[in-house]
A protein has these predicted regions:
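Alpha-helical and His/Cys-centered functional microenvironments
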Residues: 16-19, 864
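Beta-propeller folds
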Residues: 7, 12, 19, 25-603, ...
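N-terminal hydrophobic alpha-helix used for membrane targeting or insertion
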Residues: 17, 305, 846-849
Length: 894
């Protein structure tokens, strides 16, 4: 609890805590000058073999189309490096309850570390590009379109400040809107007002004074103090919790900003209200009112800032609070919440009848606000609660001691008009007790309502007339208000929406609101879905589709259908009639590209030119098969990737890379495979090494990626963890050896995060791996006493299981050379760097063969080129020494 986390970036080289004696056998060089032993000893950043470095640093082609202009004539794309710059990541920063702050620049660290430095417009009809000017030396984030599509606003971040800029689409030129620096700590984007004349921003307050200090000379003025007050507050192990009153003061200082409007014509700044700890801002269409969500005190030492309380208020243009819309209390947990895992509470008791205003949003097709409100028969008259009532406190959800909840008889959808008094409400629609999402067409003539398992289209001029859109049709949450995302349209994801279902397509309108796309005939909507193969996933791929539906007649027309031998996925329409739209096409041998489909002309044209950066990997040989373990016949799937020039009869050094998961039955495990897509192209991602594992085959290794299911009774699967882990790995190893892919005497094992945990467990249980790699893992489960991963029991409820699963307590049994890596600033719950340093201390004390590399400035996985390249260098050096060139196991003399 009192361990002080790394608070600022202050380490400038990779720290090697220990390298035990290694084999004197020299590893065969993967490239000229490659010396694994020197690589492992180096105390600065190093690089892998040249061909591996090329795979990592070669820029990937961005083919995304996610940010359309309101008329969809252009798409906006931010461009830059695929990985981060160590100089940006190393810039001084602090952690305050999980909020990462670049204190010199008054912004979130994520803004500072943005890799984007350019803005480009793409013509969706031709693929032609047009650059937008960005100031030299700036990174860009938070970009958004103006309502009429003639301008793009963005945050330009420099070394010590961020500013609002606007680019003109016609000329490509950018101008700085104001010299006032932005406070981009909690609010990291900027938006236009609905009339396009101003920007809504949060600024650094004028005259706010110097940052808080501990006291005279910055000297700590007392001990860190904690009192339980005999209150049970079980929590997962959070990173970077607030430590003391000084950090509370810092959090308040760096999150308190001034809401303002920046006039694009005059460049004048209009301040709105007093500075507050603003989390989010949403303006009415006329910018006369603002929904302002603020973080509230008290702060807590027990939970991160994301669990701190908040209040949402309605402000007028002068910053006067008109009314309080919603309040959320500090959420530290409640031990009597039976539904919360391991005592993770949900905010205390709730009233038996909730008649508060919920889902408050700006009316997308009219003035004022809209909200929903439940009606209960127990109210006597059945009338809704008074319109002026504010939102309830607490975090929502049930509590164990809550009174029995009455069943709502109906749910009303109401408008709330200025000046937002108690009598300024009007019922728009009244539905059943299961009334869900409500959305509109852009012209406001049609309302779409999800109610009691169906979606209805309702003419606003004839609210009693409803058209049922059919079985299985869905309307995504969030479609009915609030400022949407990029506007590419909702998708059905991996759900099986094969027959008469589908997800209604939405897009972002000129006012920033999300609307259901309705054709120019006023009655046609688009639905997307995916036919999933279910149990046939290993031979058939998911097949996305797009239908047009005449909701008055019920007639459906298939517009787009993915072929069986490829994977085509709808991206976005270019008009409301869906006569032109973009989609991606790929196959196991065809890299993804975006195509323009013209339905009227029945033509398709490729408009992007994606590049395969690693044909030696994308052309690798992949074998997929099932393995049965002898004890009970339970089966698991295994993928083996072999170099493209591999020939049968050649046994390679092998690497098992895995991530265990828990299941109650074989059938449940099999269902988890249903989302596998056999028609995907095997691209080489630019992301962290742990997700780019196919790079192993570039150096002559066989990569084995098995599922490692842990089976058991619900809530008790981990009681079988070590048994299943050992038996599953035995079965996998036997299978890949018997298939002739690998040499049993040259096998390594590795994993990241929970896979690292599994790896350390594996080498503490079995002796036959020649080398191992474990990164960002937790190796002592007594350090996560109130649950981890899918384990919901506490250490005190399942002590034997926690201890049995902790490889730290079997460190003396480890004989496999183990390379650990960990990020110094790992913010993932339950994988503190302490885990790696303590495990290393144990291995050092026991004289085991181990190495530890601690990466500065990095989080739960490396994000910079420097760390990425360094990791691959150390990985290859370790396995080249211990696995690829491992001496043959001596067979006993008969």
């Amino acid at each position: 609890m009192f361990a002080r986390p790394i608070r600022a970036a202050a380490r400038y080289a990779v720290l090697i805590i220990g390298i035990a004696a290694v084999s004197t056998l020299a590893a065969q060089s993967s490239s000229a000058g490659w010396n694994p032993q020197e690589i492992l000893k180096a105390e600065g950043f190093v690089k892998p073999p040249a061909d591996v470095e090329k795979l990592i640093v070669t820029p990937r082609t961005d083919i995304s189309f996610t940010s359309p202009s309101p008329d969809r004539s252009w798409f906006l794309r931010a461009a830059g490096m695929d990985r981060g710059d160590i100089l940006a990541y190393g810039k001084p920063h602090i952690y305050l309850g999980g909020v990462q702050v670049d204190t010199a620049a008054n912004r979130a660290r994520s803004v500072t570390t943005s890799t984007k430095s350019a803005l480009t417009l793409i013509n969706p009809l031709t693929g032609a590009t047009k650059p937008l000017e960005v100031p030299k030396g700036a990174s860009v984030t938070g970009q958004s379109w103006s309502p009429n599509g003639t301008q793009v606003a963005y945050i330009a971040s420099f070394a010590n400040a961020s500013y609002a800029y606007v680019a003109d689409v016609a000329t490509g030129k950018s101008v700085q809107v104001s010299k006032s620096p932005l406070l981009a700590t909690l609010v990291t984007s900027i938006e236009f007002t609905a009339d396009g004349k101003s920007l809504i921003v949060v600024l650094v307050p004028e005259g706010r004074g110097a940052p808080p200090t501990h006291g005279t000379g910055g000297i700590e003025d007392g001990p860190t103090v904690r009192l339980t007050n005999s209150r049970a507050v079980p929590q997962p192990v959070h990173a970077s919790l607030l430590l003391d009153p000084h950090e509370k003061a810092q959090l308040k200082y760096y999150t308190t900003g001034q809401l303002a409007l920046l006039d694009l014509k005059t460049k004048l700044v209009k301040k709105i209200g007093e500075p507050r700890m603003i989390r989010a801002v949403d303006a009415s269409s006329d910018a006369a009112y603002f929904r302002v969500t603020q973080m509230t005190e008290p702060f807590s030492y027990l939970v991160p800032a994301s669990s701190f309380g908040s209040v949402q208020e309605l402000w007028n243009a002068n910053g006067t609070v008109i009314t309080k819309l919603a309040t959320t209390a500090l959420r530290e947990g409640a031990v009597d919440d039976g539904d919360a895992p391991a005592g993770f509470g949900r905010g205390g008791a709730q009233p038996a009848t909730d008649t508060s205003k919920r889902n408050i949003n700006w009316n997308p097709v009219g003035p004022g606000l809209v909200y929903v409100q439940s009606v209960f028969a127990s109210n006597g008259s059945g009338a809704a609660a008074p319109a002026g009532r504010g939102g309830r406190g607490g975090a929502g959800g049930r509590a164990g001691a809550a009174p029995a909840r009455a069943q709502a008889t109906s749910v009303r959808y109401l408008s709330w008009l200025p000046p937002f008094g108690a009598a300024d409400t009007q019922v728009i629609y009244e539905g059943g007790p299961a009334l869900g999402t409500i959305a509109y067409s852009a012209d406001g003539k049609t309302m779409f309502v999800a109610d009691s398992g169906s979606v209805f289209a309702i003419r606003t001029a004839e609210p009693t007339k409803r058209f049922n859109l059919g079985r299985g049709v869905t309307l995504a949450a969030g479609s009915g208000g609030g400022r949407g995302g990029g506007g590419g349209g909702a998708s059905a994801g991996g759900a099986d929406t094969s027959a008469a279902g589908g997800a209604l397509q939405t897009r972002r309108g000129a006012n920033g609101q999300s609307f259901v796309v309705v054709g120019t005939d006023g009655k046609s909507v688009a639905l997307t879905g995916t036919r999933t193969p279910g149990a046939n996933w290993s031979t058939q791929a998911p097949r996305p589709w797009l239908d047009k539906l005449d909701f008055e007649s019920g007639q459906r027309t298939r517009v787009f259908d993915s072929p069986a031998d490829g994977y085509d996925e709808f991206v976005t329409p270019l008009n409301d009639n869906y006569s032109q739209f973009l989609y991606t096409h790929e196959s196991p041998t065809t890299i993804p590209d975006v195509w323009l489909k013209d339905v009227t002309a029945n033509t398709a044209k490729k408009i992007t030119a994606n590049v395969d950066v690693g044909p030696e990997l994308t052309g690798a040989i992949v074998k997929r098969f099932q393995v049965s373990r002898p004890r009970d016949g339970n089966k698991m799937w295994v993928d083996v990737t072999l170099p493209k020039d591999w020939r049968p009869g050649t046994r390679l050094p092998g690497i098992i890379w895995f991530y265990p998961r828990e299941y109650t039955t074989q059938a449940e495990y099999e269902r988890s495979r249903f989302t596998v897509n056999i028609n995907r192209f095997p691209e080489v991602p630019s992301a962290r090494p742990a997700s780019s594992t196919k790079i192993w085959v570039s150096q002559g290794y066989a990569l084995i990626e098995p599922d490692i299911p842990i089976w058991g009774d619900s809530g008790r699967m981990n009681d079988n963890y070590t048994r299943d882990l050992r038996e599953n790995l035995d079965a996998v190893l036997d299978a890949v050896v018997e298939a002739g892919y690998v040499d049993r005497d040259r096998m390594g094992i590795g994993g990241h995060s929970y896979g690292a945990f599994g790896t350390m467990n594996a080498i503490s249980l079995v002796p036959y791996f020649k080398g191992a790699i474990a990164g960002d893992g937790m190796y002592n489960r007594s350090l996560t006493p109130f649950g981890f991963q899918s384990e919901r029991r506490s250490f005190f409820q399942a002590q034997d299981t926690y201890l049995d699963m902790s490889p730290f307590f079997r460190a003396d049994k480890i004989v496999t050379p183990i390379l650990m890596y960990h990020a110094w600033e790992d913010q993932n719950a339950g994988t503190a760097p302490l885990s790696a340093t303590r495990m290393m201390a144990a291995l050092q004390g026991l004289g085991k063969n181990a190495a530890l590399y601690m990466y500065p400035y990095e989080d739960h996985s490396v994000a910079t080129y420097a760390s990425d390249l360094d990791l691959w260098a150390r990985w290859f050096a370790w396995f080249d020494l211990h696995v690829k060139n491992a001496p043959a196991t001596k067979k006993p003399i008969p």
